């Protein structure tokens, strides 16, 4: 590139007003010159002769000065100087010193004018002439690159089920109250298989693992066959002892221990497989904790298994917490893949379209600033970063690339029109700023509509991603142009085979649409008619197990444990009496026992366990283990006596010490929200018909929370869609100032939603937490294209 072609770019960054004149007319002026003379653009200045701009008293002085300047080369150390009074565009006078010399511009001999005003002569004026916008923009990018990165170290990564519900949700309030009395139902279930499971060596190692886990500060209780209460009968009494007492292993044989475990009614199906081929251990945390804490706890448990030399025996681990940990690992792995892939794809696209390293570097910086700053908002607002939140980085990366393409395309067009430097940037911004602003507002509106969702992570995602969209506009159309003015010196040239290919495809499509409107509209109507019936096939369903492949370890291990033992989905049915000791009433216990018998007959319920099981086992043991007495006694005083004699602890996991509040723990073998909802509705129907007002009852637990999420999801989807459509219509109405035009523009905004649900109905994709957000996101992205059209 020649020195002459580089000169305007250098003059743009000069710290004083500079202009070039040829034959008395301006052929170039930098931004400072236009600013000092009060002109908005060079187009306004170009038509004004230099002589008309100078006060009439100085015309002769100007002519003499220009003649002298034509004889002075730019390389000389001293150049002709003079003082002039110029007329600004607003007719105000401007006194300035003028230093001029001969230069080349556009292949012609010209004169370069360098002005020095009163403001430029003093320190404040010189400081004011510095490119502060450039410096401040660089400072902004630096700060918003560094500061968010420090905040991200405090990011609370938490995908635990608790964070998905509002605090005042009835199921949450009920579960919170339940956990004040009874242990957590989100647990680790460990299953061991191998030879000689009931041998001295294995049981010693097994109990050693139990003791190690109990020492962990995060663990509240460990349920194992070596600590589980076993109620044994005598001739006139009963005793409570460990199911297997490791202190007395020498007094028993492995076969006897196995038979004792398999025949124990309190642990049947829970602590051992029916054929004795597997033993279980259940670790119950003190609190749920966030996902990172759960991951750390799982690793501690596995380390304890390793230390106990039982790793070869551990064949499966399941429960809500291992499932959450698997989701966390999947989320982190996917983010490590898709975020770099999205950024790399975007940067490759920028290079392919424009072949300009400056554009690629600015795109990388912009994507980093936008995504890091937006995710850092989670830290500032003390909100958990969930599986839902992980959509933000790739989404905002893609939206940032889209905005950058508009900016760079504007610069390319301005360059083709002959603009350079600040004028090129100003022309590009003038072309794209208004549609870019409305696109940002409407896209943010579509995302913010998710703020109406009652599911907290979806609401937070919508509001924070909306802020991120507005940040894209600020960075791309307000910050980066100041950088481009400083560093963009070369013209933007046509790129063979890239932008031409895209333009060719777009041109072919719109030409076909304009030439064949009836055919296009007819085809669209036919497709709508064919797709509409599929909307009825959209199924609202969530199954966390289905988030993983069928052969994923967490699904395989869950299936294996449920085949060997019982279902891992926990539901608690609460029964409360009106007064203390109310649950000692035989009629009350029989009502609860009848419910248990009914629930055990349901195919989805593998186990129903609670206070009546303990009382029944005490009655059986007290009567010399006579099978005829394995039932509830009908004498309140006898029940009271049994409970007084009982000196174990396991019963208090199911009833409080006042015998007023109790829970029946159900183990369910289904995991989808709809299946769980059907089970819960059947339970409610039974309790309404058979218990009624005789006892206060309610359903709680992890299963209830998960099932209620379905209703929240549906209501949130309806509210967010309507909110997005109304908000975008208002934006369109304001932008177009026409009701019918705004209504017409809603068609391309609704089309992606319609297509999404048609595809979901056709392919059987569920409407769950992940797909529920796609509609609102699609509206926001679709309206971007509508605005630009």
Positions of PLM-derived features:
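Transmembrane alpha-helices and their membrane-interface boundaries in multi-pass membrane transporters
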Residues: 380, 397-409, 433-452, 457-498, ...
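Helix-loop junctions and hydrophobic alpha-helical segments within the transmembrane domains
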Residues: 414-441
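Interfacial helix-loop-helix hairpins and adjacent transmembrane helices
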Residues: 120-142, 426, 474-528
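PAS-family sensory/regulatory domains
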Residues: 44-57
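Solvent-exposed, non-transmembrane loop/terminal regulatory segments of multi-pass membrane proteins
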Residues: 153-196, 203, 249-271, 510-514, ...
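Short loop/turn elements at sensory-signaling interfaces that couple input to output
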Residues: 98-114
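Interfacial segments of transmembrane alpha-helices in multi-pass membrane proteins
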Residues: 332-385, 453-456, 719-764
